[in-house]
């Protein structure tokens, strides 16, 4: 599975309600740019929570 396959899976999961937002890419599980709000893993972007900025921009938090 390539990084592009992973991004495609993330995009598809957004329609299931597990993840919402537009995650542009991930590097070692850290969101790089875009917005990623997850109802499964709070603080999934570099350990930040509740819509605080991620390490490389964008927002992370919980639904």
Curated annotation (Swiss-Prot):
Name the record gives this protein: Protein sigN172
């Amino acid at each position: 599975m390539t990084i592009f396959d992973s991004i495609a899976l993330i995009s598809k999961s957004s329609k299931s309600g597990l993840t919402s937002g537009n995650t542009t890419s991930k590097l070692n599980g850290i969101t790089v740019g875009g917005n990623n709000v997850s109802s499964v893993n709070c603080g999934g972007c570099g350990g930040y929570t509740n819509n605080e900025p991620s390490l490389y921009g964008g927002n992370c938090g919980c639904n």
